[in-house]
Amino acid sequence: KVCRQRSAGFKGPCVSDKNCAQVCLQEGWGGGNCDGPFRRCKCIRQC
């Protein structure tokens, strides 16, 4: 199963999946990407 959660530390609009993924990795997640109509940074990991 894959768990997704909005990044706690990402600031501003999410325009780069790479930047989002780096923030998520620092938060202990497996990665992340920009998602949804408001382009929020969502972190992902196996759970």
Curated annotation (Swiss-Prot):
PROSITE patterns referenced in this protein's UniProt entry, alphabetically: GAMMA_THIONIN
- Superkingdom, natural source: Eukaryota
InterPro entries cross-referenced by the UniProt entry: Defensin_plant, Scorpion_toxin-like, Scorpion_toxin-like_sf
In chain numbering, the residues marked as site (Interaction with trypsin) are 11
Q: Pfam families given for it?
A: Gamma-thionin
Gene Ontology terms: biological process:
defense response; defense response to fungus; killing of cells of another organism
Disulfide feature? 3-47, 14-34, 20-41, 24-43
Q: Which UniProt keywords apply?
A: Antimicrobial, Disulfide bond, Fungicide, Plant defense
Function of the protein: Inhibits protein translation in cell-free systems. May inhibit trypsin.
What is the similarity comment for this entry? Belongs to the DEFL family.
* Protein name, as recorded: Defensin-like protein 2
